[in-house]
């Protein structure tokens, strides 16, 4: 067998439909677009327009709102913290806070604080001072011999 003899399996590929190649082809003349009208023309149909029928975005009721006062936390996983400690970017002997995480390049911006989640494994004995943490994350930190100080009680 040579490279020029390799073929796809039978039925693995499908011939493309050649449109507008004469009426004998079965998809000539209108090329499957029906007769006249906006959708028969070139160019894209208007998004959300359903041909005079009440569109879905108007049939469904409005719901919810965006709370402009909501706290926005930067999420950091324990695996990322461990990777930074392994790469000697974070000093595990000192207290690790949002500023230390930013300086180490673990997070880009602080926003309203840092929230720690339990993704990944933590082997280092780390003392954290963050705005919030999930319960499994707190358990993993304490199991590794570290400590955590939550700055806001609402973020647990």
From Swiss-Prot:
Region described as Disordered: spans on this chain: 1-39
Similarity-based family: Belongs to the universal ribosomal protein uL15 family.
Domain of life of the source: Bacteria
Keywords recorded for this protein, A-Z: Ribonucleoprotein, Ribosomal protein, RNA-binding, rRNA-binding
Chain's role: Binds to the 23S rRNA.
PROSITE patterns the record matches: RIBOSOMAL_L15
Keyword Metal-binding appears in the UniProt entry: no
GO CC annotation: cytosolic large ribosomal subunit
Record-given protein name: Large ribosomal subunit protein uL15
PANTHER family: 50S RIBOSOMAL PROTEIN L15, LARGE RIBOSOMAL SUBUNIT PROTEIN UL15M
A matching Pfam family: Ribosomal_L27A
GO MF, one annotated term: rRNA binding
Ranges of Basic and acidic residues composition bias in the record: 1-13
Quaternary state and interactors: Part of the 50S ribosomal subunit.
Organism whose genome encodes this protein: Rhizobium meliloti (strain 1021) (Ensifer meliloti)
Record-linked InterPro entries: Ribosomal_uL15 (IPR030878), Ribosomal_uL15/eL18 (IPR021131), Ribosomal_uL15/eL18_sf (IPR036227), Ribosomal_uL15_bac-type (IPR005749), Ribosomal_uL15_CS (IPR001196)
Feature: compositional bias, Gly residues: 21-35
GO BP, sorted A to Z: translation
């Amino acid at each position: 067998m040579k490279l020029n003899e390799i073929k796809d399996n039978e039925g693995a590929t499908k011939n493309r439909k050649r449109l507008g190649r004469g009426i004998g082809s079965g998809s000539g003349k209108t090329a499957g677009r029906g007769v006249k009208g906006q959708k028969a023309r070139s160019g894209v149909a208007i998004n959300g327009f359903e041909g005079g029928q009440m569109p879905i975005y108007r049939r469904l009721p409005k719901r919810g709102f965006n709370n402009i006062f909501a706290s926005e936390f930067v999420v950091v996983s324990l695996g990322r913290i461990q990777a930074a400690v392994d790469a000697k970017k974070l000093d595990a002997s000192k207290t690790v806070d949002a500023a230390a995480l930013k300086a180490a390049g673990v997070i880009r911006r602080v926003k309203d604080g840092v929230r720690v989640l339990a993704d990944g494994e933590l082997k280092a004995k780390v003392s954290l001072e963050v705005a919030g943490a999930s319960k499994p994350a707190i358990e993993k930190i304490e199991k590794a011999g570290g400590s955590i100080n939550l700055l806001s009680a609402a973020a647990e």
